[in-house]
Structures are given as C-alpha cells and as structure tokens.
C-alpha cells in the first residue's frame, strides 16, 4: 500500500490521519489468542442466570462479587507501536473521491475506530476494516454513536458504564481504585505521625519543621498553570500521584484537566475531546498503572461546581459551532463570512455615526460653556467697576450735608436742632387746623342713655295738643 493510502484522506466530518508513521497496522495478538480472550470474557458463571444486555452481566450473580472477580486484562494497546494504516484508510480515500465528484456519502458509511485495537487484542492488523489510530476532534460529528460506532443510550446506566448518553457530551472519566503515591500529605507517610498533633514535636519524633527542612524548600509554582487539588495542602503528593495518572492517560489524547482526590484513591480525568475520552475508557478499563491495582474506569457524573457547569456549557456551545462549520460546504462558509463582514461594516458605520454625533454634541457643549464663562467674567468685571465708582462718590456727597447741618445748628443757638424745631412747627399748625374745624361744626350730641328717652313722644301727648 502506498504512502498516500497510509496517510488517509478526508471524508465528511473526518480528518486525514497524520499522527502515525506510514506503515501497516501491526497484529496485536494471534487469532487463537483472540478467540481465547473472547471466550474467557463471555464465560458464564456456574450460578448465573439470564444475561442482562443492559447491565452486561448475568442474573443471580452478586454485583460486588462479580466486580471483585474481574481480573486484569492480558493485553493493552500501545499507540506508538500498534498504530498504522488499515483498509479503513482506503475507504476514506474512496469517500473523498466521491465527494469531489459530487456524490453524497451516507452517514452509515462512516469509518470508526477498532474497539479491539483499543483493548490491545486485534488479530487483523492492516486487514482490519476499522481505523487503528486515535480519533480526531471532528472525526465523528454524529452524537448518536461513539468513536467505535456503537449506539449511545438515552441516559447513563446506574453504574455509569457503557457507551454513554446521547443527550450529553461527557469528556470526564472517573478513575477509581488507584494506588496513591507516598508523600508528605499521604496518610501512610512516615512524616504524617509527626504533625498529627498540630505540629508539636512528639516524644522521640520529629516536628513539622524538620519534615519540611528534610524535604527541602517547596518548589515555586506558577499561579497561572498550577491548580491546587482537593483536600491537599502541599503540591508534592498531588504531583506524585498526578504524574502517574497523567502519564498513563495522556497516551490516549490531550488532557484538559486532572484532579486527584487525596485519601480517596480516585481521580477525574477530563480530555479535551469526547472521542479521546471514549477511546481511553475502553483502553484503560481493568488495567494497572505503576502497581498491581486494577483500576475502575467509568463516566463521571456532573460537576456540582457552578464555575465548572458554566465552563462546560461554553465548551459545548463552541463544539456545536465547530461541528456545524465542519458540515457546511465551502460556498456556505464563504457566504457566512461575507455576511459577517457586512454586519461588521454596518456596525462600524453605526459606531462612526454615533461617535460623530457625540463629538458634535461635545463640541457644542464646550462652546456654550466657554461663552457662559466669558459672560460671567465680564459681569464680574462690570460689577467691580460699579462698586469702585460708588465707593469713590460716597465721601463727596456726605461732606456738603454735614456742613449744612452744622450751619443750621449754629444759627438756632438753642438746645434743639433745626429738625426738631421743624417737627414742632408742623405739630402746631396741625393743632390750629383742628381748632378752626371745631368752630364750624355743631356740638356733639350727648351719648348718655337718657338721650333717646328724652326725644321719645307718646300718642296721648299728641292728642292733648
């Protein structure tokens, strides 16, 4: 097979493979070994009843006992050694040629990854009809199937296993039963007994300061890149366990976040893309890390942290936009870009008009304020000039009046001044006028109580007269 076939071709929603060398895929196991693994995997226990296709186990078998009896897998995928081109790459090339000719490609013709390759037990190698490589971000735009072509369920199973839910994009895996590395913060660390009493030195033991000095100074952490883990006071233990988990899971794709719960023997691994999480779940199920533990890999439930929920919603929105853009044709993309350019131009024009209007209003406002300030300055200058003129004219008007009053006082030569004498004269004239008026008018009528009776006449007196 040529190098062009090895590199693969593009198809609707799929990207050509470039992460592996142009070589045929290696057969991971022989056909006999594969048959033995399949027979052991589907073996029916003696006390088992009907096989439940939902929970993928037999009825009548205790769940805890069944989980404890799960042994470590005999095979494991090695991406650097096992990946290569298969018949699926030829299928991708054929689909790309059909698309260039204008023929549509049905969704059921999509090419998926090999699940046996992910588990490390594919006996076909280059003759396999599935891809022997890691999935790409936009390889599988359909949310109804996983990267292996299996249909998703409407909701998660009770034990969070299986293919996942088609109503949610889950990129986080729960990894349980991991072996925690020993460190300062580990419960089984030798130095833990030295500071369980609050840092006080025990009899014949060491203090917390001795432990810190022995381990050396703490390395400086970058606040932008370092993320403190849950239930952790020092980064040494987190880094020790985190390095092990990251080394084993980073082989299956780019890791976005990793959180190790110290003292609980579990971790949460969040991949950047959901397809990588699906591949890692099948590749690491019932595997071991650096020790003989058998880890339990399941889908993680929703994070109750509001910040995490907001971040997941934003990532889902961006992923939806990328999926829509991947399914659009070049003409539709160009039309959308032109429409956005026109909208941006109209928005810029609107902003220019608004800025011009604001600039004109600011200029008129500044002009009015300058005119008011000039008028105020002129008014204050005129007021100051008028006040100075009034102050200068006041002494000249007061001097003649004082001289005239002094001359009048000298002429009279009496104890009373001229003003008092004029008032007395006016009072005398008023008294004389009132006396003359009393001579012309008749005398007033008496106002006693008998006056009305004296003027009363009876009818008998009129008759006598």
UniProtKB/Swiss-Prot annotation:
A zinc finger (C3H1-type) spans 113-135. Residues 1-21, 408-437 have a biased composition (Polar residues). One of its GO terms (molecular function) is zinc ion binding. It is found in: Nucleus. One of its GO terms (cellular component) is U2-type catalytic step 1 spliceosome. It comes from the Eukaryota. Its main location: nucleus. SUPFAM superfamilies: RNA-binding domain, RBD (SSF54928). GO terms for biological process: mRNA cis splicing, via spliceosome; positive regulation of cell cycle; positive regulation of RNA splicing; spliceosomal snRNP assembly. Residues 207-225, 346-355 have a biased composition (Basic and acidic residues). Residues 227-302 form the RRM domain. The keyword Cell cycle applies. Residues 1-28, 181-241, 346-371, 391-465 are annotated as: Disordered. Keywords: Cell cycle, Metal-binding, mRNA processing, mRNA splicing, Nucleus, RNA-binding, Spliceosome, Zinc, Zinc-finger. The keyword Transmembrane does not apply. Gene3D superfamilies: 3.30.70.330. Residues 391-407 have a biased composition (Low complexity). Associated with the spliceosome. Belongs to the RRM CWC2 family. The C-terminal RRM domain and the zinc finger motif are necessary for RNA-binding. Involved in the first step of pre-mRNA splicing. Required for cell growth and cell cycle control. Plays a role in the levels of the U1, U4, U5 and U6 snRNAs and the maintenance of the U4/U6 snRNA complex. May provide the link between the 'nineteen complex' NTC spliceosome protein complex and the spliceosome through the U6 snRNA. Associates predominantly with U6 snRNAs in assembled active spliceosomes. Binds directly to the internal stem-loop (ISL) domain of the U6 snRNA and to the pre-mRNA intron near the 5' splice site during the activation and catalytic phases of the spliceosome cycle. This is Pre-mRNA-splicing factor CWC2. It comes from Mycosarcoma maydis.
């Amino acid at each position: 097979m040529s190098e062009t076939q090895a590199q693969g071709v593009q198809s609707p929603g799929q990207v050509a493979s470039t992460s592996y060398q142009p070589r045929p895929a290696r057969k991971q196991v022989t056909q006999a070994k594969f048959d033995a693994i399949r027979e052991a995997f589907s073996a029916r226990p003696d006390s088992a009843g009907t096989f439940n296709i939902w929970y993928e186990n037999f009825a009548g078998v205790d769940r805890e006992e069944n989980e404890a009896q799960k042994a470590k897998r005999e095979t494991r995928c090695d991406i650097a050694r096992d990946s290569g081109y298969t018949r699926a790459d030829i299928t991708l090339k054929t689909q790309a040629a059909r698309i260039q000719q204008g023929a549509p490609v049905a969704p059921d013709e999509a090419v998926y990854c090999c699940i046996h390759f992910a588990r490390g037990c594919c006996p076909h190698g280059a003759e396999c009809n599935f891809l022997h490589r890691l999935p790409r971000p936009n390889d599988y735009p359909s949310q109804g199937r996983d990267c292996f072509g299996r249909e998703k369920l409407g909701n998660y199973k009770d034990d969070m296993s299986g293919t996942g839910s088609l109503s949610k994009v889950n990129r986080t895996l729960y990894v349980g039963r991991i072996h925690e590395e020993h460190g300062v913060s580990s419960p089984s660390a030798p130095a833990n007994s030295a500071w369980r009493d609050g840092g006080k030195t025990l009899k014949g033991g060491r203090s917390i300061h001795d432990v810190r000095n022995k381990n050396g100074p703490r390395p400086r952490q970058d606040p932008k890149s370092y993320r403190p883990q849950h239930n952790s006071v020092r980064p040494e233990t987190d880094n020790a366990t985190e390095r092990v988990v990251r080394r084993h899971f980073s082989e299956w794709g780019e890791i976005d976040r990793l959180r190790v719960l110290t003292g609980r023997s579990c971790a949460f691994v969040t991949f950047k893309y959901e397809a990588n999480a699906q591949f890692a779940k099948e590749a690491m199920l019932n595997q071991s890390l650096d020790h003989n533990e058998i880890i339990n890999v399941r889908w993680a439930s929703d994070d109750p942290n509001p910040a995490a929920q907001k971040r997941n919603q934003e990532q889902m929105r961006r992923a939806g936009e990328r999926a829509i853009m991947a399914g659009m044709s070049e003409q539709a993309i160009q039309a959308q870009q032109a429409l956005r350019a026109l909208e941006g131009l109209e928005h810029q024009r609107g902003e220019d008009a608004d800025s011009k209007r604001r600039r004109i209003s600011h200029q008129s406002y500044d002009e009015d304020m300058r005119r008011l300030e000039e008028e105020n300055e002129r008014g204050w200058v005129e007021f100051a000039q008028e006040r100075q003129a009034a102050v200068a004219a006041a002494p000249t008007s007061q001097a003649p009046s004082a001289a005239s009053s002094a001359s009048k006082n000298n002429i009279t030569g009496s104890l009373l001044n001229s003003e008092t004498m004029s008032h007395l004269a006016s009072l005398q004239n008023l008294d004389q006028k009132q006396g003359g008026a009393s001579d012309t008018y008749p005398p007033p009528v008496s106002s006693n109580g008998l006056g009305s009776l004296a003027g009363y006449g009876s009818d008998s007196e009129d008759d006598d007269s």
